[in-house]
């Protein structure tokens, strides 16, 4: 085993467990440092989103005889760094290796393993995860650069995801978790046009939500974020003539008192909107219906918020039914995408196998070239000394054959003694006898 992925996602684990194993930027750096210091792997890439946490590792020194030991060590490390119970983690954890690992990454980056089938947002998240690891290894070159194998896998993955987008219809509709959140709002309220909508956060997900809402003619839009400058930049990116109010999180209670809909997605490690804060807002609003869609992991809204009168509280996990419709629409395109991924992952794995033994192949060829040059030099010298040309050529061909087949013959004898029938069959097929 040289390449391993292990992780959890929305299919295998609840939002509560996903919160526990999410990587903040600080913890990501700590993880990359630990992985290298403990020699768990040569290099790694950590993908942490609302719906999944995955660690991709490469260790060329792990062979078939100790791959299970390595896997166990990786799982134990994963549990330790997040301080979660090992058995609880194992019940939700999946792992893949080599060909299956490369295929899994390509499926993830192409949106085939997302909550919404084919959603494009994940590709950007995979690229960002790769870039963060690449930057880490560049800044810490004393511990080594990212391995060629892992780098090649991610570059191949990006090209594959682009091919899937180009050659299939899987990305024609703009669907994402953000789109699902907006769809939910349109299902609960007849019209969004005259409602006050509060967005908490200013990241990529909130940007997508904003664009969906503006396309549906929303007039009362406000954005709350920890830093006003980032919220201002988001409004600039939206390039809209619609007035959008922005304010910092210390005025969140004021925003809640005006909001009919709250959609939140921040990177906060703690709850931002408590039940008490919502209750105060609802009292001021005379308990008019309020929809809260919390698409952050860890969650931004206190879990018991849905118990408040006239409050409709949804998390990422609650969006499943809305998303299922989109999945059904994209099944046909996904089959074509799976075929592309099967081709590309097999192509990468063939490269990986050759690359692993590239030094062996190169050394064998260099050795053969040295033998050829040595024997040729002796033959030319013999001809210059006036020896019979046919005899010199016969001797040259005989010695060249004998020396070149010496190592392969020894290898065959070793395989015979070891009972390695698969190796012998592969060898006989290669030399066609």
UniProtKB/Swiss-Prot annotation:
Keywords: NADP, Oxidoreductase, Porphyrin biosynthesis. It is an enzyme of class 1 (oxidoreductase). The active site is at 50 (nucleophile). One of its GO terms (biological process) is protoporphyrinogen IX biosynthetic process from glutamate. Substrate binds at residues 49-52, 114, 119-121, 125. Possesses an unusual extended V-shaped dimeric structure with each monomer consisting of three distinct domains arranged along a curved 'spinal' alpha-helix. The N-terminal catalytic domain specifically recognizes the glutamate moiety of the substrate. The second domain is the NADPH-binding domain, and the third C-terminal domain is responsible for dimerization. Belongs to the glutamyl-tRNA reductase family. Catalyzes the NADPH-dependent reduction of glutamyl-tRNA(Glu) to glutamate 1-semialdehyde (GSA). During catalysis, the active site Cys acts as a nucleophile attacking the alpha-carbonyl group of tRNA-bound glutamate with the formation of a thioester intermediate between enzyme and glutamate, and the concomitant release of tRNA(Glu). The thioester intermediate is finally reduced by direct hydride transfer from NADPH, to form the product GSA. This is Glutamyl-tRNA reductase. It comes from Histophilus somni (strain 129Pt).
């Amino acid at each position: 085993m040289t390449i391993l992925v292990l992780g959890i996602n929305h299919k295998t684990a609840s939002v509560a467990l996903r919160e526990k194993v999410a990587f903040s930027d600080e913890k990501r750096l700590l993880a990359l440092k630990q992985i290298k210091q403990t020699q768990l792997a040569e290099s790694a890439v950590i993908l942490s989103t609302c719906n999944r946490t995955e660690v991709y590792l490469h260790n060329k020194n792990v062979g078939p005889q100790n791959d299970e030991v390595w896997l166990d060590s990786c799982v134990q490390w994963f549990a330790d760094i997040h301080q979660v119970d090992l058995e609880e983690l194992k019940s939700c954890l999946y792992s893949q290796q080599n060909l299956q690992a490369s295929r899994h990454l390509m499926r993830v980056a192409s949106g085939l393993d997302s909550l919404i089938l084919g959603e494009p947002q994940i590709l950007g998240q995979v690229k960002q995860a790769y870039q963060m690891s690449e930057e880490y290894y560049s800044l810490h070159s004393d511990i080594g650069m990212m391995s060629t194998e892992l780098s090649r896998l991610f570059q191949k993955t990006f090209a594959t995801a682009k091919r899937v987008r180009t050659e299939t219809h899987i990305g024609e509709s703009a669907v994402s978790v953000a789109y699902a959140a907006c769809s939910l709002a349109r299902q609960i309220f007849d019209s969004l046009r005259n409602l006050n909508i509060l967005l908490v956060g200013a990241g990529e997900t909130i940007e997508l939500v904003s664009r969906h809402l503006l396309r549906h003619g929303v007039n009362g839009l406000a954005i709350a974020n920890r830093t006003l400058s980032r919220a201002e930049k988001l409004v600039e990116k939206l390039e809209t003539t619609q007035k959008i109010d922005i304010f910092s999180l210390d005025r969140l209670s004021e925003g809640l008192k005006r909001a009919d809909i709250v959609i939140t997605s921040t990177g906060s490690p703690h709850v931002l909107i408590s039940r008490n804060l919502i209750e105060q807002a609802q009292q001021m609003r005379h308990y008019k219906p309020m929809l809260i869609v919390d698409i952050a992991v860890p969650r931004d809204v206190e879990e018991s918020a849905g118990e408040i009168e006239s409050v409709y509280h949804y998390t990422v996990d609650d969006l499943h039914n809305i998303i299922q419709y989109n999945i059904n629409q994209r099944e046909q395109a996904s089959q074509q995408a799976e075929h592309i991924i099967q081709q590309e992952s097999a192509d990468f794995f063939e490269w990986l196998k050759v690359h692993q033994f590239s030094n062996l192949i190169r050394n064998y060829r260099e050795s053969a070239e040295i033998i050829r040059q040595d024997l040729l030099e002796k033959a030319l010298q013999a001809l210059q000394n006036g020896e019979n040309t046919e005899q010199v050529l016969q001797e040259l061909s005989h010695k060249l054959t004998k020396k070149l087949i010496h190592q392969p013959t020894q290898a065959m004898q070793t395989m015979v003694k070891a009972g390695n029938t698969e190796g012998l069959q592969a060898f006989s097929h290669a030399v066609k006898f």
